[in-house]
Swiss-Prot record:
One of its GO terms (cellular component) is plasma membrane. Keywords: Bacterial flagellum biogenesis, Bacterial flagellum protein export, Cell membrane, Membrane, Protein transport, Transmembrane, Transmembrane helix, Transport. Belongs to the FHIPEP (flagella/HR/invasion proteins export pore) family. It comes from Buchnera aphidicola subsp. Schizaphis graminum (strain Sg). Pfam families: FHIPEP. The chain crosses the membrane at residues 23-43, 44-64, 71-91, 121-141, 209-229, 247-267, 285-307, 311-328. The keyword Lipoprotein does not apply. This is Flagellar biosynthesis protein FlhA. InterPro entries: FHIPEP_1, FHIPEP_3, FHIPEP_4, FHIPEP_CS, FlhA, T3SS_FHIPEP.
Amino acid sequence: MINFSSFFRIIQNLKKTQWQTLIGPVLILIILSMMVLPLAPFVLDVFFTFNIALSIIILLVSMFTRHTLDFAAFPTILLFSTLLRLALNVASTRVIFLNGHNGTHSAGRVIESFGHFLVGGNFAIGIVVFVILVIINFMVITKGSGRIAEVGARFILDAMPGKQMAIDADLNAGLIGEEEAKKRRLKITKEADFYGSMDGASKFVRGDAIAGILIMVLNIFGGLIIGFFQHNMLLGKAAEVYTLLTIGDGLVAQIPALVISTAAGVIVTRVSTNQNVGEQMISQLFCNSQVILLSAIVLGILGLVPGMPNIIFLVFTVSLLSLSWWLSRKKNNIKKNVLISDSKYKSRENSISEASWNDVELEDPIRIEIGYNLIPMVDIQKKGDLLDKIRIIRKKFAQEIGFLPPLVHIKNNINLKRTSYQIFIKGVEVGQGTCFYGKYMAIRSGRETEPLPFKEVYEPTFGLSGYWIDLNFKNKAEKKGYSVVEASAIIATHLNFLISKHIDELFGRQEAQQLLDHVNLEMPKLTEDLIPNIINLTILHKILKNLLLEEVPIRDMRTILETLSEFSIDQKDPNELTSLVRIALSKIITQKLFYKKDIIEIIGLEKNLEQLLLDNLKGQNNTIEPSLFELLMIKTQEAIEKQKLINAPIVLLVTHPLRFFLSKILRKKFPELTVLSQFEVTDIKKVKMTSIIGS
């Protein structure tokens, strides 16, 4: 009883420690044991059967795999299967030499059956069949798959920089998150490792084929010597027994080798899609009824040649004609269903009903209108990913800015060009562009080596030049240094840019209330004391909108509300309260504008001009003389151009009383300019004025 309880305890511990990890070491021990220890014929039959079953499983898995990386362990499995076959060859050779003189059954039933059944009693035929199998495996399948793996590894490595840049572009545009970027980079690394491993693993199979020929020769001559000299067998009898066993041994090892070589060829030649190999072959071979019809005609003509087996050709011709008719009928039914759907849709349009309040449509905060050819981008059944990219944009926006933007509504506009799209903010068109579904845009990155043979276009977001290219040109463009992105990414990047530019328009009272309700869950005491006892929702909304207008994130609601609680008792002006909140958020503002910069290069204001502006504001109720205004615009333009030349931030640093006023009047003409007060830059940063706006 004690022994049984100990045994069950060991089994339970194996379950807890993931027994799968023991398979590799155990398999290696078994293979080494087969090479060293003598095996009984029955055990040899078991291992030969296991080898055949393993090769069939590997082939079927490779056939049903949809993506290459789904079977990433294949190179390792190829190594183990090759070692297993070689170990079986060693073990079977030992058994044949030790027991071969007792008859063909002495080496096991599997070897004997392969020797008798496949050879058919003729040793010459057996040798020829064995040599043909080895030639097919060595010269055709293994050599071809090895070359494909070698070229695939080279192209995968060459394409890695381009793929990495595309991932970085999606990440910088906010189309993907950090986790998704890590997954894509890991996938690229795995692909390179896989094809590199396959390049080396194919050498195992070629070496196995060569070893099979040498082992066959050694077994035949070794068997003749042992049978004739040691066991006093007649030379003819020894040749009969040992040749049959050797050929049976060779065939039972080479057939699984041929199957696994075929699996290797399937793995490296397949194209990664959502279909397995069988589905790809059927869908692509039998997709065109005209091709099948022409094949039937050619086959029928060949069947009329005198001496041909007419019945067989006739059967295949009729079969192909039937298949062509069925495919053509299926295609016509699909077209007919589409026409019926269109007619039903038009009939519904023609039935006019009375107007009602249901016909009154409220304006969407954010709307994208797309042309007919871009509809597949939002069709989930056609693998359209634009909706997923928009969800990622909204989520990233909420995490970085601090509030959830409104939903994006997408509709088809039949009046647009088929490849065009428009983006609306509260019913006003703020952007438009052209996209081609199924194509990619190769954007100039500054590292490209040569232009592409396509019409040059401009990316709608930043005006970068590029080319619309087909999928089969994607790898070439990446190798030439272009950043290649898909069509849906162009629209998503454009949308993300426009949302950022109109962020204050999207933050209404409804969003302010939703944000306040969300903050109330975390800080109920702070919100209850402040709103509506000290300030109301209208003032809070105005303050937050002022911050968003100048692209200041409102994530840190704790600091914002605490600052308002401190100063809003005596101060009710939203603009003044906004200035105080900005000072409290100075670390966030500084980090956003000058990330990882110890010395910040900014635009300064000459003291005489600064004093002139202060005096002008005090005397004329926050207005400025036209001549002074014109001078300010000219000097600001010059300073901005200088900042651009030295690649410095376009930031103007002024005294606190001037900040709000200058930001308001300069923002309209210079939207890229950020105006800060001296209190909004943290003390840890060293300020260097690289441009001066002077009188």
